């Protein structure tokens, strides 16, 4: 994942900042609790493709940032 891309790309729902989860290969929107998959190195920024995160997952991401 190119970290320069993270400066440009935003959540398609709220236009907020995304965080990269290297282990799960996802871009995380903490505001909307959505995890967008990265397939073959390409972020899939479609809301229907995003995984809904639990509150525990979001809190875990917050403690790691």
UniProtKB/Swiss-Prot annotation:
Highest taxon above the source species: Bacteria
Write down the Gene3D superfamilies for this protein, in alphabetical order.
2.20.25.10
Q: Which InterPro entries match?
A: Trm112-like (IPR005651)
Q: Which GO terms describe its cellular component?
A: cytosol
State the family it belongs to. Answer: Belongs to the UPF0434 family.
Q: What is this protein called?
A: UPF0434 protein VF_A0426
Biological source species? Aliivibrio fischeri (strain ATCC 700601 / ES114) (Vibrio fischeri)
